[in-house]
């Protein structure tokens, strides 16, 4: 008996336009299954169908058979399906509701009426698997740590079918390979693991079957090597000329702590005007905190951050409003920045002009989404819209925190190409945090490697290959 079997499944949200058509697939226990495909093709819709979210929460026209352990779940309540299928969604912040790691993991187990002894055992087990401390505060976790937490919370509930929607999105290479190794071990122990993911280079060595979603259908891929080549294209790289440029930011002995927990200590480096600087480091090392300090969303506990935005080198600007208008920040979570009723209004809200907003939207491939509500988009589409909205303001300094999350390889290459073209045209300064080895070098003139809250290396892009080599060696 298959763990999951879909027979002649069709689905449309509006009753007219089919998202999936005549889908027939079978997934077994003891396997890791990869669901791949371009953004917006229906991968998440497939997840929602298998997990019972469609039609229990999300409406639409669903036909065909959706079998879990041989039983059709279309008429089942969501609570019944959830006892068989565990789901880790893309957006960690939408799933974390408790204050501590321990409470978050315990929450799902309590809803399943586990005994206190079993809950304690499950918490210990999954915390070891995911390298989490039970006492950590949920709101203080990095993006990668949050991803590991929601994965741990799902595994603790003990369903034998586990679906993960882009679980590697906020993980560095070592963390991504550690998670995939853990999932492979679970499959060998009898689980059915389903992973929806764009980072094929990391995932493929760990999976047993590969399914491609595209053109409304789902097909199994047998030639992985050619499939990887088809999904990959060469990224355009550019090199900025900034020899002799002044620092736009100069950090000297910067430290930052929350209560007694030190996050950064003695950070010193310059961001040169007109350069593309990439910040590297493992999850939780302080990269996002550095961006918040540079953009004045936080104040350093110690040290000095000098700025050269207002053509007057110093710590503070007399025209703070003007200063902030020259800084564009794209957060890790696009939901924090999407608040208008349509994509068009979102991108034009603070844009330099309506015409420029249209131009930027066209470049990022989101103009055709103008009539859509931002919150109705896929995570990859949300990311492109949030970046386009910030770029449309024409900032002198563009700060990007994990901009490629949720992008398939084609979308990633397009994003890198557009960002580099805009950088060349506007001579802006770009500061990017990324753990994505597929694009780091293509967005970089200078690299700053953060380790244990301080700068390990700062210099040219040669540090990128060194970082990812070490990152891969440190997995597990």
Model-identified regions with their sequence ranges:
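Conserved ABC ATPase "signature" region
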Residues: 117-134, 355-369
